[in-house]
Amino acid sequence: MEIAMKVERVVAWLREQVEESGTTGLVVGISGGIDSAVVANLIYRAFPNQSLGVILPIRSHQDDIDDGLAVAIACGIKHTTVNLDNEHENVLSKAINALQKLELYDENKLRISDANLRARLRMSTLYTIANNVNSLVVGTDNAAELHTGYFTKYGDGGVDILPIAGLTKREVYQWGEYLGVPQSVLNREPSAGLWEGQTDEKEMGTTYEMIDDFLEGKEVPQKDKEIIERLHGISHHKRVMPPLPNI
């Protein structure tokens, strides 16, 4: 019952955000993960006829695409797929070639710059679509990701509103169960699908359970506490506006 009340509160909040912004609907990128699945369900409840889910594969695993489609079909949201493979390859190859000509290219930094490029291409596409249908772009970051900075600046962090940023990862799963998210999505290990074997927890160096406990004020091992505090500190710039000089 508590989840039901909170869900209705967020749905009402989504309607308020749209009304205050002068827009008429909501757009979300659906990745096939639990966070975007929950958000897709929430925005569909708020605007059954004016919500849109966009699946944006970029050299994505077929399982991710299938889970994204399953989410959209299960919740009933209007959805479309925009494949960005060619656009990604075009931008990445041109950037690499430009740096190679200047002898500045660093192969060791390709993986992270590639991952961030994918997130930013998706963001640009979502805003292009949202502008055309007079909608807000809805983010999918949860409290753990927001606190640790586990998102791409001006990528998946480039959104208008963040309806589940107050939920821990475990709460997101609880909401997913309540909202009827497909079991395949509930069972999958959290991953951005950026490269083979990539998972959120491997990349962060700690677990969502530890981060959730930390955010709830519970005791966590010193090693995990230090990792969480370090991630929060180095990602501060992602949560604020760019600095300005005092001229």
UniProtKB/Swiss-Prot annotation:
Pathway: Cofactor biosynthesis; NAD(+) biosynthesis; NAD(+) from deamido-NAD(+) (ammonia route): step 1/1. Pfam families: NAD_synthase (PF02540). One of its GO terms (biological process) is NAD biosynthetic process. It comes from the Bacteria. Belongs to the NAD synthetase family. Catalyzes the ATP-dependent amidation of deamido-NAD to form NAD. Uses ammonia as a nitrogen source. This is NH(3)-dependent NAD(+) synthetase. The lineage of its organism: Bacteria, Bacillati, Bacillota, Clostridia, Peptostreptococcales. The gene is nadE.
